Amino acid sequence: MHDMAKKIDLDTALRIIDAAKKKAKELKVAMNIGVVDEGNNLVAFERMDGAWLGSINIAMNKAYTARAFNMETKTLAPLCQPGQPLFGIHASNDGRLIIFPGGIPLKDGDTVIGAIGVSGSSVEDDQAVAAAGAAAL
């Protein structure tokens, strides 16, 4: 019998967000953190106290991008520069694509079952916090 992949339900999404928040607190940064399921539907979102309002949509769109392409948003950045094969892609999908670090697909083995998106600090901090959340899966 074939095992079914895990699903990103609310409890799972909240566990991922809690792990991400723990890392954000270690880094002393306030983040916006969103988790989407396999259908790219928002399951949970948290804005830490003091997190930038302008980063709310960025965090959600990082999760959207990571799930839409099943790759980390940091992987898209070099491919989207002038002269590169995906230049201009960030203008597609109604402008929702984010091509800098902080979005990571969530996987059960090799199967992508959702994504996390984080925004609110430097891209290095965003990526580290997203990675901590993804590791909690």
Predicted features by range, described:
Residues M1-L137:
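Flexible, solvent-exposed loop/hinge segments and secondary-structure transition points
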